[in-house]
Amino acid sequence: GSSFSGSIGFVLAAAGSAVGVGNIWRFPYLCAKDGGGLFLLVYLVLVLTFGFVLLTTDVAIGRKTKKNALRAFEALNPKWKFLGKLTFLVPTLIMTYYSVIGGWITKYFVTYIISDGKDAATDGYFTAFITSDISPIVFMLVFLALTAWIVYRGVEKGIEKFSKIIMPGLILLILVIAIFSLTLTHTDADGTVRTGMEGLAFYVKPDFSGLTVKRFLEILLDAMSQLFFSLSVSMGIMITYGSYVKNEVNLNKSTNQIEIFDTGVAFLAGMMIIPAVFVFLGTDGMASGPSLIFISLPKVFDAMGVLGQPVAIAFFLMMGFAALTSCVSVMETLVANCMELYHKPRKKMCGAVGIYSLITAVVICLGYNKLYFELKLPNGSVGQLLDVMDYISNSFLMPFISLLTSILIGWVIGPDWIIGEVERNGEHFKRAGLYRFMIRYVVPIVMLILFLVSTGFADLIF
C-alpha cells in the first residue's frame, strides 16, 4: 500500500490536516473573549493532557491495524464495526461544504490580486457574493479541482510532497503578517491612539477580572471544544494518516510535533489578527468565524492604506493553504475508505468521490439562494444548509464518536493495546500513566459534556 516516506512527511501532512480555518477564525476570537493569556494557559494544559491522548489514540489505531476507520474498528472488535461507519460519516458530511468555504477564500484572494479590495471592505459585500447564483460555484470548483488533483497523485507524490512545500510557506506567511501587525498604529477621530503592541498585550496578558467558577468552566469548555475540533480527531482522518506511517517511525515524537505545529499556528494567528483588529476597530471589532475573515479583516486591510493590498494577498493565500491541506485530508480519508471498501484503484475512487463532492457542494452553494432556509438548531444558533451539515458532523457526531472510542479503548480493548503500539520499537512512552488515566476516566466524561453542550442538549436537560 501507500505510505509516507518518513516521519517528517507524516508530521507535516497531519499538521496540515489539523491546521484549518478554525485555527485562524475561531482561536483568536475565543482568546480575546476568554481573558487572553488565561485562555492560552488553559489551552496549553489541555493540549498536553487531553489533546495528546486523542491524537495518539487515532494515529496508533491506524498504524497498528493498517486500515481506515471503516475497517479499523472492526479489526479492533467486530461488535464495534458500527463505530467505523459512524466515523466514515463525518468526512462524508464535511466534504459537502469544506470546498465551499475554500471557494470563498479563493474569491477574496483573487479579488485582492486584481483590485485594491476597497469593495470587499464595504458592508454587504460578503453576503452579496455568497447569495449570488454562479460566482460561489465557480470559485468552489477551482478549490475542489486543486484538492482532487493532489489526492489523485497519491500519498507520497501528492499529499506529502504538497505538505512539505505548503506548511513551511504557511508558517512563513503567518509570521510575516504577525510581525507586521505588531508595528501598526492608528489614531481615532477623537485622538485615541492604539498600537499593535497594546493589541498584543490584550491578547497574551491573563485577565482574571470577574473570574468566577462558572466563568472558568466556560473558558475551560471553550478551550476544550476548540482543541477538540482543531486536532482533526474522530473524523477518521488521523486513523487514515496513521495507517500510512511506517512502523519504525517514533509515534510519541510525531504526535508531539503535530500538537506543537497546530498550537503554534493557532497562537500566531492570534498574534496576527488580534493586534490588527484592535488597532483599527478597537476591542469591539473581534468577531468569530466567517464574519472575522470576510467582513472585519477586509475593513482592517482597507484602513492600512497602500499596504493593505499586499497584506491581504498574503493573508488569503495563507488561509487558502490552511483550508487546502485540511480539505485534502478529508477527501483522502473518503478515497482511502472507498478504496478499501470496493477494492478499486485510487484513480477510480478519486473520480467517484470528486463527483460526489462536486454535486453536494453545488447544493450547499445553492443553500444561500435558491434553496435558502433558516433552521433553529438545538444549540440556539440559526443555520442555513451549510451550518446544518457542520452541526451534524462537528457538534453531534465528533464528540459522540470520541466518547465511544474512549470507551472502546479504555474499557473494552484496554489502553495497553495503544501503549504497546507507541512503544513498538522500544521507545519509552513517558506519559503512559497519564494516557491510561485520561482515556478511561477523563476523556469519556469530558466528551459527554462536550457532546451535551455543543449539541445544545445540555440546555434542554438543565
Segments and roles (model prediction):
Residues G1-F4, E160, K164-L324, V328, ...:
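Membrane-embedded translocation segments of transport machinery
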Residues G1-W25, L54-V59, R63-A75, K81-F82, ...:
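Membrane-interface "cap" regions at the ends of multi-pass membrane proteins
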Residues S3-A14, L40-V42, K79-T92, V138-F143, ...:
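Select transmembrane alpha-helical segments in multipass membrane proteins
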Residues G6-L44, I237, K253-N256, I260-T263, ...:
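Transmembrane helix-boundary motif of multi-pass solute transporters/channels
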Residues L30-D34, A60, A75-L76, F82-P91, ...:
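Membrane-water interface regions at transmembrane-helix termini and the short interhelical loops
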Residues L30-D34, K67-L86, S99-G158, H186-L221, ...:
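Inter-helical loop and helix-membrane interface segments of multi-pass membrane transporters/permeases
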Residues G102-T131, G242-E248, K253, Q257-V265, ...:
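Helix-loop-helix connectors at the membrane interface of multi-pass transporters/channels
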Residues N379-G410, K430-F462:
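A generic transmembrane alpha-helix motif of multi-pass inner-membrane proteins
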